[in-house]
C-alpha cells in the first residue's frame, strides 16, 4: 500500500528523484503518518529533491460496521469493509506533532506543509509555531464553505496586528 511504501525513505526517495527529472515545477510530497518515522522519511525526501514535505492529515481506521450485514461496507462505492481515512479536529494534536518532528529533524531551510484539524486562526497559528510554512485545510472548508478562508485570513491578520507580529512564527517552538 501507499502507507507501507511511504515508510521506506529509500523507496520514496527514488520516486521523488524520478519525478524531479521529469518535471520543472515544485514537487510537494505528502507523507503517510503511519509507521512513526515521518521526520526521517522527510529528511530522505528533501535530500532526493522534494521542494516541500508534509504530513498527511488523516489516519487509517476501520469505518463503522454494518451490524445487519457485517461483510458489506457502509460506503456504497465498496463491496466489502476496508480501511478508511479519518481526519478533522480530533487529529490536530497528531498533525502538530508530525509538523514539529519534521521541522525539528530537518531544520529551518526546508519547506513544510501542514494539514489536519485547522478550524480557526488559533489552529493555524499553532501549525506555524510547530514548523509549518504552508497550511492545507479541507474538512472545515467542506463543513463551512469557501467563505471560511477569508474569515480565517482576516482573523489571522487581526491576531498578528494585536501581537505586533510581522511574520508567521514558523518554527517558533522548534
Task: Give residue ranges: language-model regions.
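Metal-dependent enolase-superfamily TIM-barrel catalytic cores that perform enediolate-based chemistry
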Residues: 1-22, 31-32
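Glycine-rich phosphate-binding active-site loops on the catalytic face of alpha/beta enzymes
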Residues: 48-63, 117-118, 123-151
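Generic structural signal for well-ordered alpha-helices
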Residues: 12-17, 39-43, 99-100, 124, ...
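Glycine- and other small-residue-rich loops at beta-strand/loop junctions that grip anionic moieties
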Residues: 4-8, 30-34, 84-91, 113-117, ...
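Internal active-site segments that recognize and position negatively charged phosphoryl groups
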Residues: 27, 31-45, 57
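Glycine/Thr-rich beta-alpha phosphate-binding loop at enzyme active sites
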Residues: 1-10, 41-42, 48-108, 144
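C-terminal helical cap(s) of enzyme catalytic domains, especially alpha/beta-barrels
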Residues: 63-83, 128, 139-165
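Short beta-strand/loop segments at the ligand-binding rim of alpha/beta enzyme cores
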Residues: 21-32, 104-115
Amino acid at each position: 500500500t501507499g502507507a507501507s511504501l511511504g515508510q521506506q525513505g529509500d523507496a520514496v526517495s527514488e520516486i521523488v528523484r524520478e519525478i524531479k527529472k521529469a518535471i520543472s515545477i515544485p514537487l510537494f510530497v505528502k507523507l503517510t503518518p503511519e509507521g512513526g518515522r515521518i521526520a526521517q522519511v522527510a529528511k530522505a525526501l528533501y535530500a532526493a529533491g522534494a521542494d516541500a514535505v508534509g504530513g498527511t492529515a488523516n489516519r487509517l481506521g476501520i469505518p463503522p460496521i454494518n451490524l445487519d450485514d457485517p461483510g458489506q461496507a457502509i460506503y456504497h462505492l465498496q463491496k466489502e469493509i476496508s480501511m478508511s481515512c479519518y481526519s478533522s479536529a480530533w487529529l490536530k494534536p497528531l498533525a502538530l506533532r508530525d509538523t514539529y518532528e519534521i521541522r525539528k529533524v530537518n531544520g529551518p531551510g526546508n519547506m513544510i506543509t501542514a494539514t489536519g484539524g485547522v478550524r480557526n486562526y488559533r489552529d493555524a497559528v499553532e501549525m506555524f509555531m510547530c514548523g509549518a510554512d504552508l497550511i492545507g485545510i479541507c474538512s472545515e472548508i467542506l463543513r463551512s464553505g469557501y467563505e471560511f478562508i477569508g474569515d480565517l485570513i482576516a482573523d489571522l491578520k487581526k491576531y498578528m496586528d494585536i501581537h505586533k507580529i510581522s511574520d508567521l512564527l514558523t518554527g517558533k517552538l522548534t
